[in-house]
Structure formats: structure tokens, C-alpha cells
Amino acid sequence: MDRPLSSSAEAEEELEWQVASRRRKAWAKCRSSWQASETEDLSTEATTQDEEEDEEEDLPGAQLPAAGGRGNVPNEKIAIWLKDCRTPLGASLDEQSSSTLKGVLVRNGGSFEDDLSLGAEANHLHESDAQIENCNNILAKERRLQFHQKGRSMNSTGSGKSSGTVSSVSELLELYEEDPEEILYNLGFGRDEPDIASKIPSRFFNSSSFAKGIDIKVFLSAQMQRMEVENPNYALTSRFRQIEVLTTVANAFSSLYSQVSGTPLQRIGSMSSVTSNKETDPPPPLTRSNTANRLMKTLSKLNLCVDKTEKGESSSPSPSAEKGKILNVSVIEESGNKNDQKSQKIMKKKESSSMLATVKEEVSGSSAAVTENADSDRISDEANSNFNQGTENEQSKETQSHESKLGEESGIVESKLDSDFNISSHSELENSSELKSVHISTPEKEPCAPLTIPSIRNIMTQQKDSFEMEEVQSTEGEAPHVPATYQLGLTKSKRDHLLRTASQHSDSSGFAEDSTDCLSLNHLQVQESLQAMGSSADSCDSETTVTSLGEDLATPTAQDQPYFNESEEESLVPLQKGLEKAAAVADKRKSGSQDFPQCNTIENTGTKQSTCSPGDHIIEITEVEEDLFPAETVELLREASAESDVGKSSESEFTQYTTHHILKSLASIEAKCSDMSSENTTGPPSSMDRVNTALQRAQMKVCSLSNQRMGRSLLKSKDLLKQRYLFAKAGYPLRRSQSLPTTLLSPVRVVSSVNVRLSPGKETRCSPPSFTYKYTPEEEQELEKRVMEHDGQSLVKSTIFISPSSVKKEEAPQSEAPRVEECHHGRTPTCSRLAPPPMSQSTCSLHSIHSEWQERPLCEHTRTLSTHSVPNISGATCSAFASPFGCPYSHRHATYPYRVCSVNPPSAIEMQLRRVLHDIRNSLQNLSQYPMMRGPDPAAAPYSTQKSSVLPLYENTFQELQVMRRSLNLFRTQMMDLELAMLRQQTMVYHHMTEEERFEVDQLQGLRNSVRMELQDLELQLEERLLGLEEQLRAVRMPSPFRSSALMGMCGSRSADNLSCPSPLNVMEPVTELMQEQSYLKSELGLGLGEMGFEIPPGESSESVFSQATSESSSVCSGPSHANRRTGVPSTASVGKSKTPLVARKKVFRASVALTPTAPSRTGSVQTPPDLESSEEVDAAEGAPEVVGPKSEVEEGHGKLPSMPAAEEMHKNVEQDELQQVIREIKESIVGEIRREIVSGLLAAVSSSKASNSKQDYH
């Protein structure tokens, strides 16, 4: 006993320090060395020692026999358990320390500090007597219950403090003194339940998630909201909380998608206040819903998350859309004949309705009732759709309030659901009614929409009023097929809302769980059918709302079309041509968006029967258009936007499907406007008049759009194409639809208005959602004027930026030729005038690129920024979509922030800017964590094969950092240019702005300043890191002058892309090249680019030219297309230019600031400078065309010089001064870099000798 006593005394003396340190070491070893071999060896030794020590040290304690028993049996169990955990070492050491610790704890109550490991704790706990364990287990349960009653969760303590056998802290407390924090918590001090964030290390919150679209704050808030919503105690309030949760989630996802797609989310910021704003602020719901649909469309077009977004979020809209889509899709896919399509539609309608239980009843009931109430149902449905579409104000108020509630509550989905449901129910009603009384549906649709608009307005109002309550009830009230058309439309729309909401947010919302079930089934089936359709189906999903309107209608139209044609001929004979044209346009959009088969059918709008579903959709669209025709301009604009959407969708595949939906939505929106105008009128006559006028305008729109779609053969009717072409030339190319129409019918409509079709090359450009742009080469000037007029007149506060050059699509080459023609039409590209591409693009980069920052390496973020949101995406279409969507958003916000502020809550812009700030700060944090070369001796590192092998990585890092820095510099310059242009534009309208708008302008200005400052800080950090990396690379790269040139060549070639020279030996050559480059840049910047830009309006030209000069001359991460986009010159402005955009689309050039040949063009040299050998070697082949392209552009600018007005001459002088300043700054920066290169090279040479000496020392 003496020995044990002495050992126990020693152990007691050791315990608090040595034992703790020993346990720490053991735990560290367990953690660090997971190899079984090491741990087993150590564990065996330690186990033997531990058992001895356990026996010896436990003897003196009061628990000697128990300790001895534990030393044998429990330790074995622990060892087995630890072996299972692959921590035998920890087990043995833990046993060793735990036995002593246990004795000490029992005796001294000493604290083991915080280094108790699971293994150690497990050992210690297992050591406790079996009786104690049993008692502890019982106590654990009781105390666990007590703790739970107290609101304390034993999860963290139990998992952290106990092995697995001990389940509660109370058990541990009996064994030893608990952690003081736990004791205090148990005693009631502090919060009973520490904040979740307090238990999560701050490192998880310091930087945003690298995953795509993950925001921890949004996630946590959504989880908390969901917990609250799911709490049964909330009862009724939980429903409304669900709405809020849905709104929040939808807002978050919308913002995320807007970042990805670059589309503006105008109402996202007001989502929280949407509940109050829903009724009062219908436009925000429109914006939000439109944003959601637009985002889905954009995503489907971009193919970024087509399956996920469309099937995930659009899945909720798909129920109604699924009806129409399944019907349409199945009809389109399965139906060979209209009759077959009709029967299939009927069958599928029934199937889809059965799939959608609520909708089924509604559909079946509506179809049954539609036979009787076909007119009323269709009127009600159509009134719902048309009310949604037609009563813009009322619907925007009621429907938007209703839908905004839904859209905001259920997020984007519900607004879609309303419109979709109305559309789908309408289409279903139309299907049934059209099947039964097609003629009625068609003629009555037209009159009914206006007639039913008031009643529907009431119905919609009822829906709106009862929506939140009925939102829950909407799933319950599945008897919407009640004879009351209102109820049908309402219940259907509500059910659709609920269905969509349920499908999208079934977890959190629980709105229409039944509906959700139906939705999920239907949605799945629909998605399957849509999947069969392909991306068009996806787009259909995302655009279900519009699709339901268009496709559902189209689906019944198959049956209804012949009748409709008849009825149309009967009631719309005079309008038939216009309707056919409008239908052709709608069909065009629809077919373009849905399918080319449908497009063909639509093309045969004259023979609308050819494709029943497209025709029907066209018919309905026509009717909607008829209703909308009072808002013909808007409708046309939106149709044009829809057409541009169709063009985009057709370009991107079946996105066209979405387009036609959008078209219809636009038509519905316009119909709403027209309904507003003829709200009280029965509408059949007014709808007819509207149809006549609207059809004419639609024809004009179609013509303008047809120019763009000429090659699409969407409309086969040559008359329509010719007329559209003529109309396009007639000056209808640019129409501005009113700012986002009501959300209910089609958020997509807003999307439609957002889309801008640029040139006949099918290139589509997304402009701010409020605008629909028809882009025809000859009309661009008129469009500019009109756009300016529209901007001045319309309340829409987005600017029309039609920069064909900004559209970067694979089809761009095709459209480049027409663009060249446009440029040759004698007018400067309107794009540059309307919206300085640099502005739009830098803004784009602000919004769309920053959204991608988290997904990409920091260097790539800056790269994309500099390239104006031309991400390093291999797919040209992706980048094309990204830029158009991003640019328009930036356009409207950047150029006309005041407008954006007035119409759209500044929150959207602020959110974008704040996101940019957040991303920049994240980039700063990430940069601070950016891996630097780590090595005990960087100088000697090159001599180790491992280091040399890693060197290329650091070289790439160095290059990327340089590229990032230059990109940031360029981006910041572009931001400044944008701000200058914005300020110039604002000065003209600032005195017209309201106080709120001015406040928003000031606020946005502050945000932009913050962004610029953050960018500057980021540049500084990048510069510092570059210097550090450069030093390390130099040391590694040139350990000694005798070092083999292979390593230097490897490193140097990689860094050649950077201004840094691979080695001091090559410094002079790059220096000479840099000086020559600067001379070229000076001459070209001062003369060519400055003069080029002066064609652009001074406010914008200076910025665009300035930024272009900087970007092109410095060639900061910019390809030739970058310059083109910057200048806003169509990508085909010159033959050389047309080549460069293609190259840019194919690759994103990463070039040093002044070294890349992408500078306007050095007339004589097509060769890339030697320092471009590195990463530019790949691009060398493209470098020549780039050089030629900018050169041609510069020459073109010179050629245009003579035509510049005197005022522009003066402005030119100012620009010249600015350009001279830029040149000086560039020269200074280059000279400084060259000096740093030389100095660093010399230092490297010196350090290399030292390195060789040190190497000798080491070896």
C-alpha cells in the first residue's frame, strides 16, 4: 500500500498539471495519429501502464475495489470502444489519466480543464462502477428530464462530456466537478439556452459559405422561423408565420438567384414589409414575382440550375403549369392531330387534374361546369387570368396584393401560383369549355376577360381579401369549381398558390399540404413530361405561371382552336389578322418558348388549328391581347420582351416555352392595363377594339421581333414576318412596357418586359425588367430616342440599355453581321448611347459577378469583374445570359438609379450593392487567408523536388493575384466611370426627383463609395500579397544564377502573364516592351479611343470610352470583346471586332495590365509581347485577332471622328485630359511595377547567392 499511496500522492500532485498535460498529449496523439499501427503500439504500452497505475492509484481511493474492477473490465470495454473508434491510444492514455482523474475528482473535485476528450471521458465514465453507471443512467434520465423541463438541452454537454454510455451532464457531475460554465448554466446563471451562434465557432460566420447560394444568416433565420411556424402553440398565427417564412425564403432565394442571373430583384428588399405592401404595393409583388419567374427563366436559359430551380422552385408553380404544361407538353409531344391533342388534352387534363387533387376537382368541376359555365368559368378563369392580365391596377392592387401576399408570402411561387392557377384553371376551364364550347371560350374569352374583369376583380379582391385566410383554406376549399366563377378562379388561383407554395415551401409553409401532395404528384408528372420536353419543360416549370396561362390555354385550344378560329373569325374577323399576328406573336413566343412544333402551329396562326395548344394559347393570348390592347404599347412592349424572351429561350433551347408564357403574361399584364382602362366595360367590344389596335401594334411588334426571329421560322406566315419586319423598321422596335405589371398573372411578364431582343441575330439582351426592347438595326436611333422619351415619360425607372455588344451569346456571331449592318446604318450603336456598356457591364459585374464570387476562386471573381460579368464559363451561352441579365440590371440601377428608386424600392439596388460589399469583404477575408508560400527556407525550397513541384501552384496564385488586382483596379475604374455617367444623368433629372428618390440616390452613392473603398482596400491587400508572393517566388525561382533555367522558365512563363518578369535576366526585355506598349497606349488612348467614345453621348461616352480605354489599353483581364462591350459598340461593329468577341466568348483572357495586345491595337504588331508568353501563350493565337479587332475599332473611331459635333469636341478635350491622366497613371503604375521587378530581380539574384550558400550550409 505504501507504493500505491505514494503513487497516488504523486498522482494527486501531478493531476492538475501533469495529468492534464499528459491527457492533452494523449488526445493530441489520438487526434493526430489515426494510424492503427502507431496508436495500437502506444495504446498497448499505455494500457499496461495505465492498468498498473489505475490499480495503484485507485487503491488509496475509497473506490479501490471498484477501481480495480474498472481497471480491468471497464478498461477493456473502453479499449474495445476506442478501438472501434480507432483511437486505442486515446483509450489507453485516457484510461491512464482517467483512473487517476477519477480518484482525484472523487477526492479533490479537481477540474480537468477543458481538454477532456470523448475518449478520455468515455474511459473515465466507463471506469465508474457499474452500479454507479446504473444509478447514473437512472439519474441521467431524470435529470435529463429536469434539464429539458428547464429548457436546457443536454445534447452539447452530453455529447461533449460523455462517451455514449453516459447520457447526461448530471451523471458526469456526480463523477467530477463540471465545467464552471456548465455549472453556472445549470445554476440558472446566464441564458438557459445559449445562443446557437455562441456554440458555433466564429470561423463559420466570419466568411460566407463557399457553397452556392448559402447564407448562414438567412438559413438560421429561416430555421428559426420554421421552428416558430411548426410550433403547434402558434396555431393560427403559424399559418401567417409560414407566409412570412415563405416570403423570407423566397426573398432570399430570389436575391441569390438574382445574383446568379444578374437580374434585378426590385422588391426583394421590401419583402419583409410586403405583407403591408402587398395590397398597397402591388408593384413590388410584380417585381418579386417577375423576378422569381425571371430568375427561373434566366436560370433555365443560363442552364445554371435549370433542373433545380425550375423543378425545385418552379415545381410549385408547375402544378397549374403542370396542368397546362402536361397538357400542352403531352399535347405537343403526344398529339399529332388537333383532335388527338384535344382528346389527349382532355385526358391529360383529367389526369393532371386528378394528379392535382384540388385542381382536379376544380378542373373537372370547372370542365363540367365549364360546359355549362364554360363562358362564366372561362370568363372567371380568363377574368382571373385577364383580371390578372387585364385589370392591371385592380389586379395589381387586388391580385398583386393577393398575389403579392402570396408571392411575398409564398415567395415568388404564390404570385406565380395565382397567375398560374388562374392561367391553369383558366386553361383547364378553357380546355373543358373549349372542348365543349370552344367558340364560346374564344369569343367570350375576349369579351369575358373585360366583362369578367370587374367580377374577377371582385373575385380577385375576395381572393386577395380572403387569401391569407384562404391561403390556408385554399387547400381546404377545393370546391372552387362551385358555380361561382369567382370561387373557381379564386380557389384555383389560391390552390395554385398553395400548391406552388406547398411544392416550393411545403416544409415550412404547410399551406396546402393536400394541394402540395397533388402538386408534388402533378408536379412530378409534369416535370417528367417537361423533362421529356427537355429544357423547355424546365423553362415551363419556371414559367409555369405564364405557361399555365399560355400552355394550359393552348392545351384546351387544341380542341378549342378550330372553334376559336371559327369564333375568332366570327367575332374577330376584322381582328383575325391582327389576332393571328398577335397570336402568331404569342404563338411565336409561345412556340418559341414551348416548342418549335408549337411554333409551327403558332406560325400557322391563321390556321391556328394546326397546333391546338399553341393556337389556343395564341388565341387566348390574342384575347388577352385584345383585352390588353388598350395597353397595347405595354403589351407590345411586353410581347416584344416576351418575344425577346422567346428568342432567348429559343436560342437557349426551349426557354422559348417560357418566353411565350411570358408573352402571355405580358399580354395579361397589358390586358390588366386595358382592363383597367376598360375595367367597367363589358369588354367584348372594348376587347375587340383593343384587339384591333393591339393586334396592329402586336403585328408591328411582331414585325420588329420577327426581324430578330426571322431565322427562327417561329411564324411561318410570311405576312406576319413581313409586317413585323416592317413594323420593326417602322419604329416599334423599342417599346417600354409599364414597370412591372401586376404580379398575379405573370411575374414572367415582367421578365418579358425585362428581356430585350437586340438584333436579327437572335441575340437577346435582358434589359431592366420594366422595359421591352425591340431592337432593330435601323431603328436603334429611334429606339434611343423613344427609350429616352419612355424613360422620361414612363414611371418605369429602369433605363433601356440596348447594347447588342453586351449580348454575349454563341449566336452573337450570327447577329454580328446584322449588327455590323446596323453600325453601318450610319448611326452609332445605340447601345453605347443608351447605356454605356461599361456602366452596364461594370454594374453587371457588380451584381452578377459578385453573386458568383463565393462560387469561384477570388482570382476568378476579379477576372469576371474585369470582364464585365463574362464569367470564365466554358459555355458561351451561360456567359451570354449572365451578361445580358446582369447588365440590364446594372443598367437600370446604374444609369437611372433615380428611376429605379422611384418605381422599385431602392432595397433591390441596395441589396445588390450591399451584396457586393459583402462579397468584397469576404474576398478581403479570403485574401487574408489566401495561401502564401510556406516553407522554412524559400530560397532553398527550389532545390527540393517537392517545392519545385508546388512552385507552379504558387506561380498560378501569383498570376491570379496580379490578375485580380488589375481586375479590381479596372473594376473600380469602371465603377467610377459608371458613377460619373450616373451623376451626369442624374443631374438632368435630379431637380425632378422626389425627396425619397434623392435620399435613395444619396444612399446608393454612399453604398457605391463604400464598394469602391472596399475594392481599393482589396487592391491594396492584393498588392501586398503580390509583393510577398513575388518575393517568395523570386527567392524560390532564382536561388542562384547557376540554377538551371528550367525552373526559372517554368516559373517565369507562368508569371509572364503578370507584369512581373520571370527573372531579372528577362527584366530589360519586358521593360522595353512595356515602354513600347505605353507609347502605343498613349497614342491610341489619347486619340483613337477618346475619339471613339465621343460619338457616345458625353455623359455616357466619356465613361464608356474612358473605361474602355483603360480596360482595352491596360487589357486588364479583358479580351477584345471586353472592349467592345465596354464601348457598347456592337460586337460586329467591325469585322475585326466581330472576330474578337468570338474569341472572348471562347476564352477569357487573363493578361497583365498593359502587356496584353488586347489594347486598342498596335497597328503594326500582332505579336504578343514576350512577357505574354506565359499564360498568354494559349491566347497568343487569339491575341492577333484581338489586336486587329481593337485596331479596327480604333480606326473606326477615327473614321467617325469627323462627324462629332462641336460640343462633343469640347467634351473630347475633357476626355482627352482624362485619358491623359489615365495614361499617366498607367505609366506610373507600370514603371513602378517595372522598378519593383528590377529590384526584386536584383534581390532575387542576391538572395540566390545567399540561397546557394545556405544550401551548401544545409547540405
Curated annotation (Swiss-Prot):
<feature type="compositionally biased region" description="Polar residues">
    <location>
        <begin position="1158"/>
        <end position="1168"/>
    </location>
</feature>
<keyword id="KW-0963">Cytoplasm</keyword>
<feature type="cross-link" description="Glycyl lysine isopeptide (Lys-Gly) (interchain with G-Cter in SUMO2)">
    <location>
        <position position="360"/>
    </location>
</feature>
<dbReference type="GO" id="GO:0005886">
    <property type="term" value="C:plasma membrane"/>
</dbReference>
<feature type="modified residue" description="Phosphoserine">
    <location>
        <position position="1063"/>
    </location>
</feature>
<feature type="modified residue" description="Phosphoserine">
    <location>
        <position position="746"/>
    </location>
</feature>
<feature type="modified residue" description="Phosphoserine">
    <location>
        <position position="869"/>
    </location>
</feature>
<keyword id="KW-1017">Isopeptide bond</keyword>
<feature type="compositionally biased region" description="Basic and acidic residues">
    <location>
        <begin position="394"/>
        <end position="408"/>
    </location>
</feature>
<feature type="modified residue" description="Phosphoserine">
    <location>
        <position position="803"/>
    </location>
</feature>
<feature type="compositionally biased region" description="Basic and acidic residues">
    <location>
        <begin position="807"/>
        <end position="825"/>
    </location>
</feature>
<feature type="modified residue" description="Phosphoserine">
    <location>
        <position position="92"/>
    </location>
</feature>
<protein>
    <recommendedName>
        <fullName>Protein ITPRID2</fullName>
    </recommendedName>
</protein>
<feature type="compositionally biased region" description="Polar residues">
    <location>
        <begin position="382"/>
        <end position="393"/>
    </location>
</feature>
<feature type="region of interest" description="Disordered">
    <location>
        <begin position="31"/>
        <end position="72"/>
    </location>
</feature>
<feature type="compositionally biased region" description="Acidic residues">
    <location>
        <begin position="38"/>
        <end position="59"/>
    </location>
</feature>
<keyword id="KW-0832">Ubl conjugation</keyword>
<dbReference type="GO" id="GO:0005102">
    <property type="term" value="F:signaling receptor binding"/>
</dbReference>
<feature type="modified residue" description="Phosphoserine">
    <location>
        <position position="767"/>
    </location>
</feature>
<feature type="modified residue" description="Phosphoserine">
    <location>
        <position position="1134"/>
    </location>
</feature>
<feature type="compositionally biased region" description="Polar residues">
    <location>
        <begin position="1101"/>
        <end position="1118"/>
    </location>
</feature>
<feature type="modified residue" description="Phosphoserine">
    <location>
        <position position="1060"/>
    </location>
</feature>
<feature type="modified residue" description="Phosphoserine">
    <location>
        <position position="270"/>
    </location>
</feature>
<dbReference type="InterPro" id="IPR043444">
    <property type="entry name" value="TESPA1-like"/>
</dbReference>
<feature type="modified residue" description="Phosphoserine">
    <location>
        <position position="209"/>
    </location>
</feature>
<feature type="modified residue" description="Phosphoserine">
    <location>
        <position position="737"/>
    </location>
</feature>
<feature type="modified residue" description="Phosphoserine">
    <location>
        <position position="111"/>
    </location>
</feature>
<feature type="compositionally biased region" description="Low complexity">
    <location>
        <begin position="424"/>
        <end position="435"/>
    </location>
</feature>
<dbReference type="GO" id="GO:0005654">
    <property type="term" value="C:nucleoplasm"/>
</dbReference>
<feature type="cross-link" description="Glycyl lysine isopeptide (Lys-Gly) (interchain with G-Cter in SUMO2)">
    <location>
        <position position="808"/>
    </location>
</feature>
<feature type="region of interest" description="Disordered">
    <location>
        <begin position="806"/>
        <end position="829"/>
    </location>
</feature>
<feature type="region of interest" description="Disordered">
    <location>
        <begin position="268"/>
        <end position="290"/>
    </location>
</feature>
<feature type="compositionally biased region" description="Polar residues">
    <location>
        <begin position="268"/>
        <end position="277"/>
    </location>
</feature>
<dbReference type="InterPro" id="IPR029325">
    <property type="entry name" value="ITPR-bd"/>
</dbReference>
<feature type="modified residue" description="Phosphothreonine">
    <location>
        <position position="1156"/>
    </location>
</feature>
<feature type="region of interest" description="Disordered">
    <location>
        <begin position="1094"/>
        <end position="1137"/>
    </location>
</feature>
<feature type="modified residue" description="Phosphoserine">
    <location>
        <position position="668"/>
    </location>
</feature>
<feature type="region of interest" description="Disordered">
    <location>
        <begin position="1154"/>
        <end position="1215"/>
    </location>
</feature>
<dbReference type="GO" id="GO:0051015">
    <property type="term" value="F:actin filament binding"/>
</dbReference>
<keyword id="KW-0009">Actin-binding</keyword>
<feature type="modified residue" description="Phosphoserine">
    <location>
        <position position="739"/>
    </location>
</feature>
<keyword id="KW-0175">Coiled coil</keyword>
